A protein has these predicted regions:
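Bacterial Sec-dependent N-terminal signal peptides
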Residues: 1-29
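N-terminal leader/linker segments that initiate helical-solenoid repeat arrays
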Residues: 21-66, 70
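Amphipathic alpha-helical repeat elements characteristic of tetratricopeptide repeat
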Residues: 28-32, 36, 48, 66, ...
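Gram-negative and organellar
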Residues: 30, 41, 103-107, 111, ...
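Short, conserved structural micro-motifs that define repeat-unit consensus positions
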Residues: 37, 70-73, 88, 143, ...
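Short, compositionally biased segments
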Residues: 43, 77, 82, 111-113, ...
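Mid-chain, structured segments of secreted extracytoplasmic proteins
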Residues: 65-104
């Protein structure tokens, strides 16, 4: 009798559990209603509410693969890339729509600043289903995300016949643009939107033009095809357009000191016009005070005008005019106008050469600034990317000084980009410096100076978009002054900042014992604090 009671109680308990599960589970009609509500919210571009409807379904059935796929798409549209990554990874575990899941996971990883991982899943999707056009296009894009332009070109040549005319145009446009050949890239984009005025192609072309500072052309393209876009889609582009035209103003404060107890305090304010102009002006004014170990002090007031010139896609320039009123302690004040002119030719984003002329009043110490020694220099600057990740940078100049000295400078750098987002770059630098009169001791003027170093750069993902950013450069090597023994040399630069849509602030610290880094030849510490407002 007791056993029968126990059996009955167990059956009743089991029946109660089944009824509770059935009460919690959604029937087909309830599930479909939530899907329809999600679709309606999606049509209204209210992706957050759409995701909530799907989460209600998944709370009852976490393994509903179709709903997980739908939610992942909505998370991409809502720019919730980390959550989208988790959704697509869950789909792969459920063995559901593996090609689509890997394609979308690849894109989500790229948008979440993991291009190398994105390439892995893009390659898997293409390897498993090479006949899928979306997998083909996504794998090509992933190669470009990782700057593997040579591999991308080779891959495109093998699959070109399987693509539609529109796909061939857009992939060629992306390839040329990423490879630095912006002339052919823009030409392909132009042909694309003329022949196939799809809103995604138009938006991509317009954003590429913004990146090339062809702002008027970008705006014209979007206005010509504005009927293709919803109000919110066009508003998102308009926000990017406004950002390029923002003017800015700010203040900067500098503290510099070296081991010889030379100290410079400087504060300045500036105003700069927005981009999209053929001539973009920046005006600044400030004061500085330089104090030496023996308490010699020289103060200065200055005004500065910078003009960035655009003569076309390939030609650009920058003009600087600097007016100073300098007051040495115990002496009469004097004024001086100096400046800088740069002309730059860049027919390809991976190849640039420029000519530079500049003049300056040497201000390394209080006594030197008060002596009104001026320098006039003519030089070059060049930057060549040998591939998507390896490049050469070099600059050099020859100058004459009003104290009858002459200066010759060379700097060369070979670097390799290890990864992007965050950016990690390593390389080798070499520099040489020669003065014709090493007997002058008012500043560092060796007959022969050589320096070589290994360096590494790091910057957080997309520092121009992120709210918080951090950039670090460190280098170590050796230097030789005259014929003396080689000595250790190091360099460190770090910057921490915060950006919002209208405000920016940042603190930068630099230190180095590289003798040519400062005019005195001494180790120094240099702090710069900046505040900026954009509107």
């Amino acid at each position: 009798m007791t056993k029968n009671r126990i059996l009955i109680l167990c059956l009743l308990a089991g029946f109660g559990m089944v009824r509770r599960v059935q009460a919690q589970a959604l029937d087909g009609q309830q599930r479909e209603a939530l899907i329809q509500r999600a679709a309606a919210f999606r049509k209204q571009e209210n992706y957050g509410m759409a995701i909530q409807q799907l989460d209600s379904i998944l709370s009852k059935n976490p393994a509903d693969a179709g709903i997980i796929l739908f939610r992942g798409d909505l998370q991409l549209q809502n720019r919730e890339f980390k959550k989208a990554v988790a959704s697509y990874q869950q789909l792969i575990k459920l063995n559901h729509e593996l090609t689509i899941a890997r394609i979308n996971l690849s894109y989500a990883l790229f948008m979440d600043h993991h291009p190398a991982k994105a390439l892995v899943y893009a390659a898997e999707a293409y390897a498993r289903n090479s006949s899928n056009t979306n997998a083909t296009v996504n794998y090509f894009n992933a190669l470009l995300w990782n700057s593997r332009t040579t591999d991308a070109a080779r891959f495109l040549a093998t699959v070109s016949k399987s693509l539609s005319p529109a796909q061939r145009l857009v992939l060629n446009a992306r390839l040329y643009t990423t490879s630095g050949n912006y002339t052919k890239g823009l030409a392909n984009y132009d042909s694309l939107v003329r022949a196939f005025p799809d809103k995604n192609y138009v938006k991509e072309y317009a954003e590429v033009l913004l990146g090339k500072k062809e702002i008027a052309r970008s705006e014209t393209i979007m206005k010509t095809h504005d009927t293709l876009f919803t109000a919110s889609e066009y508003g998102a582009y308009s926000q990017k357009l406004r950002a390029t035209r923002m003017q800015n103003a700010g203040a900067e404060f500098v503290l510099f000191s070296d081991v010889a107890k030379n100290t410079r305090l400087e504060s300045s304010i500036w105003y700069q016009q927005g981009e999209g102009r053929r001539f973009r002006f920046r005006y600044s004014a400030g004061v500085s005070t330089i104090t030496s170990a023996e308490n010699t002090r020289t103060s200065a007031q200055f005004g500065h005008i910078t003009v960035n010139e655009r003569f076309g896609l390939a030609w650009s320039g920058q003009s600087d005019v600097h007016l100073q009123v300098i007051k040495p302690e115990g002496k009469d004040a004097f004024s001086g106008i100096t400046g800088r002119q740069t002309i730059q030719y860049q027919p390809n984003d991976r190849r640039m050469i420029g000519l530079v002329y500049n003049s300056e009043i040497l201000n390394y110490t209080a006594r030197l600034l008060g002596s009104n020694v001026r320098s006039h220099n003519l030089g070059y600057v060049t930057h060549i990317l040998l591939s998507g990740r390896t490049g050469i940078f070099s600059q050099g100049s020859a100058g004459v000084l009003t104290d009858q000295n002459q200066r010759y400078l060379f700097f060369g750098s070979l670097y390799h980009l290890l990864r992007t987002e965050p950016t990690v770059k390593v390389g080798l630098n070499f520099s040489a410096l020669h003065f014709s009169n090493p007997a002058i001791t008012a500043y560092f003027s060796p007959d022969r100076y050589l320096s070589t170093e290994l360096f590494a750069d790091y910057s957080t993902a997309l520092p121009h978009l992120a709210r918080h950013y951090f950039q670090l450069q460190a280098a170590g090597g050796a230097q030789q002054i005259e014929r003396l023994a080689w000595e250790p040399a190091f360099r460190l630069q770090a910057e921490l900042g915060y950006r919002s849509s209208h405000f920016e602030t940042g603190l930068k610290y630099q230190t180095s014992n590289v003798a040519s880094s400062a005019g005195t030849g001494y180790k120094f510490n240099w702090f710069t604090y900046r505040l900026l407002w954009k509107w």
